[in-house]
A protein has these predicted regions:
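Aromatic "clamp/platform" in nucleotide-sugar-dependent glycosyltransferases that forms part
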Residues: 262
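Short alpha-helical donor nucleotide-sugar binding micro-motif in glycosyltransferases
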Residues: 243, 250-254
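Carbohydrate-associated surface elements
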Residues: 145, 167
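Conserved donor-binding/catalytic core segment of Leloir-type glycosyltransferases
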Residues: 190-206, 212-215
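A charged, aromatic-enriched C-terminal amphipathic alpha-helix characteristic of glycosyltransferases
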Residues: 303, 320-350
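Short hydrophobic beta-strand element within catalytic cores of glycosyltransferases
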Residues: 279-282
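Acidic anion/phosphate-binding donor-loop and adjacent secondary structure
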Residues: 151, 168-185, 192
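Conserved acidic donor-binding segment of nucleotide-sugar-dependent glycosyltransferases
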Residues: 294, 298-305, 314-320
Length: 351
């Protein structure tokens, strides 16, 4: 890719965060490595991050707009700022007329899987997303699950959708087996117990209730280690770790990573865990399982609790045999998770 090509990126907040904010930073770093300095249009811009030096910026001034309404005005403001700019747009937020609209989740899919009835704000979000999909030249779906929802819930033509799974930070998440004994000792993880790591910033959506029901009543030598939000109550066989910044270390120290999400448009947690050499025990509705093979771990159905018990029992058996760690993570995945590959795919559909 020639370094003089230009790209615009739209995002509400250009700052460290989760979801699309994190993905936008990935795009910026990846494009920079290709010699491309994109222009970011955002309402909030963090000038202290290294990525700021890799972009040009345009501030979308929303100070006079009520906070809840700001996302609905962003697209109109963006259009005015980009008048007469013959430069392709990658929308990482709900913006219209994108050359690539990045879909990392759908609101209708979220409401359906969470069993929620849409309120007025939800209906406005759904309406806004319909115009995003309608006016975009292409929609990048971060999973086949998203492709399915775009087609079946929103009526987006299949020929308009490209499935490109999101990248993982392979420079940060990797195996380091020599560290594991010391890290486990520091956390108090016992060698005769199988530790299942549950990273969660939303216990209901991530399926804590289903997992706790099993862990609290089992006689197996297992512990559920919860990283993230505090527990709603004390639980038998459950350890509360709190928020932890060094997630690669935590993934490596655990025997397995476990999750039973009600709705997971992709789930980079699974990819990150595998890259660190730790197999997963995941519900099969999580979209990241699309890119995993049988070497990645064990999978179960949320609709059948017996399959959860079977998966955990198999995991414990593998740990007791000393065969639970993955030595070649890439062989457990069916896609290339590197940022370089993701940027190549993105540029291929953009130009």
């Amino acid at each position: 890719m020639k370094p003089n090509y230009s790209i615009d990126i739209a995002i509400n907040c250009f700052r460290p965060g989760g979801g699309m904010e994190s993905y936008t930073f990935d795009l910026v770093r990846g494009l920079s490595a290709h010699g491309i300095k994109p222009t970011v249009f955002a309402a909030q811009i963090d000038t202290t991050v290294p990525e700021y030096r890799q972009v040009n910026t345009h501030h979308v001034n929303q100070k006079k707009i009520p906070k809840k309404l700001r996302p609905f005005f962003f697209s109109m403001q963006l259009a005015k700022l980009r008048q007469n700019r013959n430069i392709p747009l990658i929308a990482c937020n709900p913006s219209d007329y994108a050359d690539i609209f990045v879909c990392g989740g759908t609101h209708l899919g979220y409401l359906h899987n969470m069993g929620k009835t849409p309120n007025l704000l939800d209906r406005l979000i759904i309406r806004r997303n319909r115009t995003n999909y309608l006016t975009a030249k292409l929609v990048m779906a971060h999973s086949h699950l998203m492709q399915h929802e775009l087609i079946n819930l929103y009526g987006v033509p299949s020929e308009k959708i490209r499935v490109i799974h999101p990248p993982a930070d392979t420079a940060r998440f990797y195996t380091k087996p020599e560290e594991i004994p010391a890290t486990r000792a520091r956390y108090g993880f016992k060698d005769d117990e199988t530790i299942f790591l549950f990273p969660s910033t939303g216990h209901t959506r991530k399926g804590l209730d289903l997992l706790a029901e099993f862990f609290e009543h089992t006689d197996l030598p297992i512990k559920l280690a919860v990283a993230g939000l505090p527990l709603p109550r004390p639980m038998n066989n459950v350890i509360e770790l709190g928020f932890y910044k060094n997630m690669p270390e935590l993934y490596r120290a655990a025997d397995f990573t476990i999750m039973a999400s009600l709705y997971e448009p992709f789930g980079l947690v699974g990819i990150e865990s595998i890259l660190c050499g730790t197999r997963v025990v995941f519900s099969d509705n999580m979209a990241c399982t699309e890119v995993m093979n049988e070497n990645a771990g064990f999978f179960f159905s949320r609709q059948n609790p017996e399959t959860l018990a079977q998966a955990i029992t198999q995991a414990v058996s593998l740990k007791q045999q000393g065969k639970h760690k993955i030595t070649s993570p890439m062989q457990a995945l069916t896609y290339n998770p590197t940022l370089t590959h993701h940027i190549d795919q993105t540029l291929n559909i953009l130009y």
